Amino acid sequence: MDFQNPGLVWGLYAAGLLVFGILYALSLKKAGLNLLCAPLSAVFGVILAVIGARFFFLVPNLIFDGGSLDADTLATLRPDEMSFTGGCVGFTFGVFIAAKICRTEAKPALDAMALPGCVLIAFARLAETGIGFINLGEMPAFLPAVWPFAILNGWGLPDFSVSTLMALAALLCALWLALSKKPSAPGYRFESTAFILCSVMLFLEMLCTTSSWIPFIISFIHLEQVLCAIILLILMIRRTIQIKKAGPLIVTALLLGLNALMQFVQDKPYLFPLPEDTDIALLSVIVFALTAAGLIAAWFWAGKTQSSSVKGS
């Protein structure tokens, strides 16, 4: 794999796994769970993360773009031909398998993994700045054109690293988890983390102007956004079944629809009767940010509804 700064990439990956292992072991110890889950999760997680990242990239491309599977295609590990969200799904399955091997309940193990997982995501996202050609956007004038905010492109000009924002979002989520002491049902901590990160990812993906990492499915929707939307719907459907109220799910579906509509407006503004002086880029940022905030609010609305139901019973 041809990286712009291979030392930075592999160094951050290694550091991320080391920090993950330490934090996960501490979380497992605090929860009274088997400490062996930590090293096993790292091993199985990395293996399944690579498989998941490749699988969730290949399958949609085969469906929408055609092509065939062969040995060379399967063995290709180009970073622009892998899905970060798919990698996260694969890593989660690795943690699940490790918990089963250690005869540990999966939900508490995943809850214990939530904070260390956020830190690992932050390291992995920051490592993308060393790859050099993925998750790039237009450089904002108010930010310094230096690493980790800027990456020099092939013409020696700075591009904005959206991966850095994604890393910061993961760290903020980790901070929230560290400060959150409120007890919750098994699995809720992990599911909340996944929902928040996918909601933020849905927003930040729209800042990417490069499509090498995320192929387009319907000319204006990124694959990563589709995967995040599917995860959001699955999590909210599970929550809706538990609380037996459809309100949060309806809000989630409407917000995802609004997100897709705004993507279409951004791609083909001439099809919509907007004022001539409308700043499409600014409008998109506002709508996508509000959509992400609305999705997170809907999730905690569902969680509050579940808590009220438990108290009432």
Annotated model-derived regions:
Residues 1-313:
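Hydrophobic, membrane-interfacing alpha helices
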